[in-house]
Amino acid sequence: LIANSDQVLVNFTGQNIVNEELILDKKITVLTISDHPLLPSGVGTQTKYVIEALLRSGKFNVISLGGAVKHQDYTPQKIDGYPGFWEIFPVDGYGNAQLVNAFINDRKPDILYFMTDPRFYEWLWSIDDTIRKNIPMVYYHVWDNYPYPKFNKRYYESNDVIASISKVTSDIVRTVAPQVEEHYVPHAVDSNIFNEKTPEQIKKVLSSNKPFQDRFVFFWNNRNARRKQTGSLIHWYKDFLELEGVDRDKVCLFMHTDPNDPHGQPVQYLLDHLGFKEGEVVLSTSKLPADQMSMLYNIADCTINISDAEGFGLATLESLSCGTPIIVNMTGGLQEQVTDGEQWFGIGIQPASKAIIGSQQVPYIYEDRISREDFLNALLEMYQMDPDKRIELGKLGQKHVQENYSFENFGKQWVDLMSSVYENYGSYETRKNYKNIKVEEL
């Protein structure tokens, strides 16, 4: 079954989605909805990590509806190599009501897990009564900023359990919908991949990449989108090169992004317009596997994220895991990465302005902007910092990630959480702790 571009339910080559293997299996079956879990997006990657942890526990099977992109091939994929059963069904968008109900009726999953921005799931929450009468709904959620989004209250209350990605999100959910079970489950990085490389490995890479040789490298790994502040980054970096004490022949801004993203600015035009010299800015435009991304963090001296809104920010967490310090805007989930409240693992820049913006779906939310002056000061401080101190910042950040965002703890949290959801809420004949009516005093 797939949902085509017109969101019409279609039989895929006459295939019956009922799977006898799952019916006979006594494992807990989870239906997931998210970005395709084999895509390199943040949502896709984290969902893959969740799924892998569940499967490796030996207690779960997983059926995934993989969306977010226009697929060239809608053939279901059975993923081998795990103790449990895992099958992925490509869908347009994130599916639709008819599709989800069909999977629930035919595959009989015990839990529905879903993840991404809430604006993509209004259709799902509109049918929560038909879903939750049979199985619990678990939402993996992040919200960028305050004020408390009271307009999300009805969505939060349409879930049995919410897992919050950041401390900001955890506080928001507990305040807006205190009766909903909530757990703080932050993102994680795989330290087997994102780790500190040896000097020999780094030297080998640098020897074949001339632009980075004998230069201080600022790394920016972000989507080229408005909230990421691409234009401000480039213009202000140009100003940084002209500061007294900066040797522009010994500094490089390394940008891993799509310079032609329709949601962003024309990066190459900006670079040409501002007259950057060769080697001052280097672009990396190809999608790279995780092990190669890990090496990029290692050849960098510092990683930057100055987004005006950032629910979490995986790139800076990956950077810290590799031992590379960060410069970030003190907003959203970036705040808990750069400091634990006592020690710092880079430089945090306090927003200079907090505008309340919004849209028809999101009536209000803070947009945190840093100032040019504060950004230049942060770049200069990192650039002029004693190398041993900068290395120590990175090592402290690495320890921070290992203690608070470890891959092992992330997996255990999800196995324990989904096991407790199954025990406490049940499914079908054992469904409990759910009422589809609410009585309020007028």
Predicted regions and their residues:
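N-terminal subdomain of nucleotide-sugar transferases
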Residues: L1-K78, R107, E440-L442
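C-terminal amphipathic helix plus adjacent low-complexity
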Residues: I2-L22, G358, V362-D368, R372-L442
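Carbohydrate-associated surface elements
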Residues: V168, A188
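A short helix/loop element that forms part of the nucleotide-sugar donor recognition site in Leloir-type
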Residues: N195-P211
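Nucleotide-activated donor-binding/catalytic signature segment of Leloir-type glycosyltransferases, i.e.
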Residues: G264-K287, D291
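Aromatic "clamp/platform" in nucleotide-sugar-dependent glycosyltransferases that forms part
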Residues: D308
